[in-house]
From Swiss-Prot:
Source taxonomy: Bacteria, Pseudomonadati, Pseudomonadota, Gammaproteobacteria, Moraxellales
Top-level division of the source organism's lineage: Bacteria
Species this protein is from: Acinetobacter baylyi (strain ATCC 33305 / BD413 / ADP1)
BP GO terms, sorted: pyrroloquinoline quinone biosynthetic process
Similarity remark: Belongs to the PqqD family.
Name listed for the protein in its UniProt record: PqqA binding protein
Pathway in which this enzyme or protein is active: Cofactor biosynthesis; pyrroloquinoline quinone biosynthesis
InterPro entries (UniProt xref): PQQD, PqqD_bac, PqqD_sf
Length: 99
């Protein structure tokens, strides 16, 4: 089991999320949704998770992702915290790595 690391928010904003080896984000026709595929199975994603994970390209930082989604959804409140919490959960599930 991966150890839980603590990252300050200011440091987290400058990390770049990338998908871990063995985990693939893709549209799954049979599920009619985006999924995370991994050797043991798949996880069907909701719309919010999909919007966040679509931003992961190995170049954008967490701050960039927050800025992009905030521009798409200017009336959303608490978006930055929601994105950060989701990315932390995705990392704890080993879907992504925050570099």
């Amino acid at each position: 089991m991966a150890s839980k690391r603590i990252i300050r928010m200011s440091d987290l904003l400058h990390t770049t999320p990338v998908f871990n080896r063995g985990y693939r984000f893709q549209w799954e026709q049979a599920q009619q949704s985006y999924v995370i595929l991994y050797p043991e199975g798949l996880v069907r994603l909701n719309e919010s998770a999909t919007l966040i994970l679509k931003q992961i390209d190995g170049k954008l930082t967490v701050h960039d992702i927050i800025q992009n989604l905030s521009a798409q959804f200017p009336d959303a409140t608490g978006l930055d915290q929601d994105i950060v919490e989701f990315l932390k959960q995705a990392e704890s599930r080993q879907w992504i790595c925050l570099q």
